[in-house]
Structures are given as C-alpha cells and as structure tokens.
C-alpha cells in the first residue's frame, strides 16, 4: 500500500541525481569556508524526519528558512522554543484565534506538534545564508522539493495543500486537484496578510476536509514536546 512507502523509498533515487549532490556539496563547502548557513546541518531535513510520507495529511509550503540566529530548524514557519515568534507565524496564530474556538496564542513558535500530526511544513528551499534571504534560491533545492510535492501527489490521496502567496501557489500546477484539496490565500506576512489571509479560514477548512474523509482533524494548538508527554 502507498502509505507504507517511506521518504527513503521514494527519494533515494532523487538523492543520487547530480544536481542534488551538487546542492549538498555547495552548502557543505560554504559551511566549511566559515559562512553561517541556516538551519544547522542536522536540521535541514527535519520536515521529513517529523512527518512520515504515509502520515502526510496537510502540506504547508514556505519559501526559504528564517535567516536570523537560532530561528530555522527545518520546519517551515516554525522557530525553536525560546526564539521570538516571527511576524508571519503571529499572523497565522491570529487567524487561528479568529476561527478555531478555544485557540489561544501560545508563547512560542515551535510547530513540531503540527508535524507529528501529519502537517508537512516544507520550505521550497532548504538552506539560507545568515542574514541573506533567498541566498540559496538557485542552488537546486526547488528541483528537489518540486519532486517531493509530485511524490506526495502520486503516493498519497486526499492531502490538503495550503498554498499561501504567489510562490507557493505556482506549485499548485504539480498537484492533481481531483486527488487532493488545494486552498489558496495571500501569504501571512505582514505585507500581505490583510489582503485575504485573515479570514481565509484555511485551518478550519482543512479539518473539515479531513473529517469528511474520516480522518482525525489537526489539533492546531502548538504544544512543546514536554507539554505533550
């Protein structure tokens, strides 16, 4: 069955492609030469570590990792415990407060509990130089993450894709709308949230879709690992 496949099963061949090896080599060379790259090497593929292929129910696409100290840890929009919640995530919390009964904004921005429930928090570019947004945008990461999206499209059924902003929405072309559910809105960034991210109701609509399919809805209240034990 498709849900028994692992990321390793479907990505092993892609990870041997010359472009991918070149991407890894470029990032490794920059780190070795003293350039600060986020996230740390051990965290680059955390989205796949925390959400197994067979568990993917929702995909939230980000662009590239946060480029400030200690922020990025491999999950789109998420920051480590103890790091100030970034503006886009604050706006996501605001939308959750306005639409999910009982949701109260947490005092952290760590979204591992979403990932553990089947929310793939995938940046389309997986590394960035410190302080330089989009500095690794042309390294080949997008070829890899486009492949990831196409593999989810192929091997999973009934996944909700939350595509926020024009960059993410372009990825909609890869997704079969007959097999999956696509929700589009402006990006939650302060620059665009007021143009329709607020009021998009995506978190509610995603759960309604999952429940209609007989699946467990996502608990959107982010909890720190110690709290959930």
UniProtKB/Swiss-Prot annotation:
Enzyme class: hydrolase
Entry GO terms, CC: cytoplasm
UniProt key word NAD: no
UniProt xrefs under SMART domains: UDG, UreE_C
Keywords annotated in UniProt: Cytoplasm, DNA damage, DNA repair, Hydrolase
Residues annotated as catalytic: 64 (proton acceptor)
Keyword RNA-binding in annotation: no
E.C. number(s) listed in UniProt: 3.2.2.27
Location of this chain's protein in the cell: Cytoplasm
Main location: cytoplasm
GO molecular function, one term: uracil DNA N-glycosylase activity
One of the Pfam families matching this protein, by short name: UDG
Reaction(s) this enzyme catalyzes, per UniProt: Hydrolyzes single-stranded DNA or mismatched double-stranded DNA and polynucleotides, releasing free uracil
GO biological process: base-excision repair, AP site formation via deaminated base removal
InterPro entries assigned to the protein according to its UniProt record, in alphabetical order: UDG_fam1, Ura-DNA_Glyclase_AS, Uracil-DNA_glycosylase-like, Uracil-DNA_glycosylase-like_sf
Physiological role: Excises uracil residues from the DNA which can arise as a result of misincorporation of dUMP residues by DNA polymerase or due to deamination of cytosine.
Similarity comment text for this entry: Belongs to the uracil-DNA glycosylase (UDG) superfamily. UNG family.
Name of the featured protein: Uracil-DNA glycosylase
Organism: Escherichia coli O81 (strain ED1a)
